[in-house]
Every structure is written in structure tokens, then in C-alpha cells.
Amino acid sequence: DLLLRLLKKYDVDLIEQSTITGAVVENGRCAALITTNNGQERRYEARSFIIATGGVLGEGFAIEPERAWEPIFNIDLPLNPSSPEWSLPEAYPACRQTPGTPRPSHGFALLGPDVDAKLRPLGKDGNPLCGNVFFIGKTLGGYDHAAEKSGNGVALSTALFAAMNA
């Protein structure tokens, strides 16, 4: 309740129960996000955008047999869903241990787009796709929130960091 009051006080739009269906990118910046809710399309313009759409299980990524990608900005993800590394037969595969975690990770659990030091998603050329877009929480790759039991901590710390850089 306190967080929602603070967000309202500082004029922050929190958009829930909507699907982001696209982005309007102009001159290296995101000008707007397009959402759909109950068949209605809406355009949100802002100075900066913090994206917290989730990972594979939260439907933040689109997946087909030969491709996985982040759908808002059409970012290809580094692991092919047809790869044997996508998931292994064992629930807790011994061959892939995430450093510092009590159990190993499946490839899909570590999936996410590459970001720079400010959490901006990178294009194929290694440069930020948009100077004003920041990815946080489970949208980030390289960590297994379930195995590490770090989901809330990563979500909160990356949200604060992104907000400070936005």
C-alpha cells in the first residue's frame, strides 16, 4: 500500500494486466510502448521505460521450436529451445551448476537478453537498442532466481538501479 501511494505521489504509471505488444523506437530511443487489454490498444509515452515482463515461465519471452526472443523489442535470445541445453531430463541436473547455488540450473532458467552496465538491452552490434529502456528482474538473464532464491532481491535491486539511471 505504501509503495503504491509513493508511486502515485511521484506520478509513476504502474501498468498491470496488459500485454505489451510493441514499441515505437525512434533515433535510438523508445518513444512509446503499445499495450493491448480487452481488445483495446493503448500507447504509453514516457521519458524512460523499465521493463519487468518476466522470463520464460512468466511469458516475458516468446518461444518457438527453433527460436526464443524478447517480443517487445524483438531481441533474439542466446539459447535455441531445440538445444539439448534448453532443459535436461533430470529436475536437478548435476552437469550445470550455477556458481553459488545449492542446485544446478536448466538453460531456460538462465535465459535473458544481454544488457549493459546500466541494464539497457543490447542489440546484435553490442550497443544499447534504446538509451532509455531498462530491463529488470526475471527479464534479465544469467541467474536462476528459483535455484538461488534471489528473485525478489534481484527484482528490487535492479528496479532501484534502473530507476536511478532512467
Task: Name the predicted role of every residue range.
Residues 1-166:
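Residues forming the flavin
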